[in-house]
Amino acid sequence: MGFFRILFSLSLCALSLAIPSKLIGLENTKDVIPNSYIVVMKSAVSEAEFQSHQAWASKIHSRSLGKRDGVLDDFGGLKATFQFEGLKGYSGAFDKKTIELITRNPAVDYVEVDRVVKLDAISTQRDAPSWGLGRISHRRVGSADYVFDDSAGSGITIYGVDTGIDIRHPEFGGRAAWGTNTVDDEDTDQNGHGTHTAGTFGGATYGIAKKANIVAVKVLNAQGTGTTSGVIQGIQWCTDHAGRNGLRGKAAMNLSLGIRGSTIFNRVAEAAQASGIFLAVAAGNDGTDAGQFSPASARGVCTAAATNSQDAATSWSNYGSVVAVYGPGADIVSAYPNDDTATLSGTSMASPHVCGVGAYLMALEGIGPDTVCDRIKQLASESVTNQKPNTTKKLLYNGSGA
């Protein structure tokens, strides 16, 4: 399914006994990145204190390496910082003694282990017909026509935080630009997932917000893998870019990825939403409660579950009270790298439908990111079948009147 997951691997029993309780994320045991951590500072820490703490952390890291005769191994030290309103911290690779000292530092709120981001299995069918656009612009099943206002997301910028985007694809007509890359040195989409999601939220043929500007933010590589800390860096870049370019209040972000139970991921998503960017996120493809995943369970984001062409919730879509709305997610055709198309399935496909409608409504109605998800829920059709208990029946609708 088209959904990215951040999970754990490696036994951490000995580590959990040695390091204070402020180190979180030890309850899972799949795909942890050895010796890699995300350090979150207490909210009262000033900028000067944050800088001082970084210098201190680098010093004790160097001292620890000195005791190891300068052997670097996997301990590269402080790698990147992040700062949102009321939330700051850094990521890095540290040995056991160093991370124990960092965790005990009174300026530190908590430390979370870093994890690998993976691409779930994707089903691909070349050049198949799509149905999602017709479905979100009609109250009833069956129409192949997409009915929409000509504003079509004009003036809104959408950040695709994913595997990158083939910005030269004809679907984007020069509206797509490269933003940043936190995972490798290849500034293109070598996987296809990111181009596909961008085609859904903003493509000329397969997209919803056909006049929106699109920015590629690559956080996952050709194999569909990255890190929690890398995704945080990507989101940080988006909020900074929106601030520098006067886009806060006129921007949306698609996150077709997730992690099981991450405090820091939820907080970063909430901070990005609060900064003036509408966030649409995938519920996940585990057929379980989306409340167990982040950022699906973050406050204020618009979490999307998936339906098929007959309005039935798919068996693999996550569900639960955190789901805001269902969107088309099975057999969705969209753009693919090298001027191609592909058909993919997953909540990764439902999320860009929600993101695209969010951008469309922001342009059409002049509403802000903080009210977009409520407006989406208000417009939605109560037509989803086969959904699990404690889950909405709301199906995405753009308000076209058809």
Curated annotation (Swiss-Prot):
Residues 36-119 form the Inhibitor I9 domain. It is found in: Secreted. InterPro entries: PCSK9_ProteinaseK-like (IPR034193), Peptidase_S8/S53_dom (IPR000209), Peptidase_S8/S53_dom_sf (IPR036852), Peptidase_S8_Ser-AS (IPR023828), Peptidase_S8_subtilisin-like (IPR050131), Peptidase_S8_subtilisin-rel (IPR015500), S8pro/Inhibitor_I9 (IPR010259), S8pro/Inhibitor_I9_sf (IPR037045). The keyword Transmembrane does not apply. Pfam families: Inhibitor_I9, Peptidase_S8. Keywords: Glycoprotein, Hydrolase, Protease, Secreted, Serine protease, Signal, Virulence, Zymogen. SUPFAM superfamilies: Protease propeptides/inhibitors, Subtilisin-like. CDD domains: Peptidases_S8_PCSK9_ProteinaseK_like. Residues 1-18 form the signal peptide. Residues 130-402 form the Peptidase S8 domain. GO terms for biological process: proteolysis. It comes from the Eukaryota. Secreted subtilisin-like serine protease with keratinolytic activity that contributes to pathogenicity. This is Subtilisin-like protease 9.
